[in-house]
């Protein structure tokens, strides 16, 4: 298992669903718990000249990125069922980053797919 590092901040929130217009879909305010990142994800973000903050915000608000329609629907169900949520995003240099919020919402981790 790769060494995990805390990133950005630690925040615990309650999940809130909002009817804010966003193309017809509700926006999640997913509780993230403690934010962690693997060394590979930290390095990939640095090489791409990007921060993980934008990706984390997309994940937190229900934009699951580049996942299949089946996985997108599973993530949407997980908001109410309390299951794990997995998002996938491509960095500017094409490297893929996954963000996983555990079912108990105590930890959200940024990692490379091969670090899973």
Please report, for each region that a protein language model flagged, where it lies by residue:
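Intrinsic disorder/low-complexity signal
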Residues: 9-11, 56, 62, 70, ...
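Compact soluble domain cores
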Residues: 21-86
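Short, Lys/Arg-enriched N-terminal segments with co-localized hydrophobic residues
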Residues: 1-15
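Short, compact, well-ordered microdomains
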Residues: 80-116
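Context-gated lysine
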Residues: 12-14, 34, 47, 92, ...
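A generic structural micro-environment signature
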Residues: 7, 36-42, 51, 61, ...
